[in-house]
Amino acid sequence: MTTTAEKVVVMTPVYNIFFNSIINNGRFILESPLHYENGAYEIDFADLEEKLSDPQASLLILCNPHNPVGKIWDRGTLAKIGELCAKHHVLVLSDEIHCDLTKPGKDYVPFASVSETCRENSITCVAPTKTFNLAGLQTAAVIVPNPVLRHRVNRGLNTDEVAEPNVFAAIAPVAAFNHGAEWLDSLREYLWENRRYAEE
């Protein structure tokens, strides 16, 4: 999705593997720091637009919900990110791997669901690995509504031979998503209780 020496924008603090992946693939990092105020992290949109407007910036890795700060971006925020990225011709890679691990009763908003602009200029990555503790199976899914972009993604996945799951990686997510809702509800309650306990 990018070429060597292009720049990838990330909103920090963020999952450290993003840094390794960007650097190891010969790209450069543009950090747009989140601001922490009144107990919450917010996007500095002036800074984000400055980074997106860099002529070498070609990709924004969006963490939604954000890891590690736990921020669930609202629809308006995601729409603004989408508009800025489209304006500056920057593709959005939305890492939504933590989407199921929200506060009980609180859902996240998928980036691609916000608008046509967001849908047509995004790649969404999801996986059962965090939610159902299946990381060892190395299974994930990539959702790309735009057919032209999907073709590029398919070519990249097959070129790098990462689209070859084993039989367990194909079956386990189906079982987890089809039969794990009750367990997931209990897990979310348990995790939220742990958080409350840690805050006391």
Please name every model-derived segment:
Residues 1, 21-22, 85:
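Short hydrophobic alpha-helical segments of the AMP-binding
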Residues 1-7:
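Phosphate-binding glycine-rich loop
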Residues 8-9, 22, 60, 67, ...:
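Generic structural signal for small/hydrophobic residues in well-ordered secondary structure
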Residues 12, 31-36:
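Short beta->alpha connector loops at strand-helix junctions that form conserved
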Residues 24-30:
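A short helix-loop-beta submotif of the ANL/AMP-binding
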Residues 25, 87-88, 118:
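Helix C-cap/helix->beta junction micro-motif
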Residues 34-106:
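Active-site phosphate-binding strand-loop segment of PLP-dependent enzymes
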Residues 116-192:
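Conserved core segment of the aminotransferase class I/II
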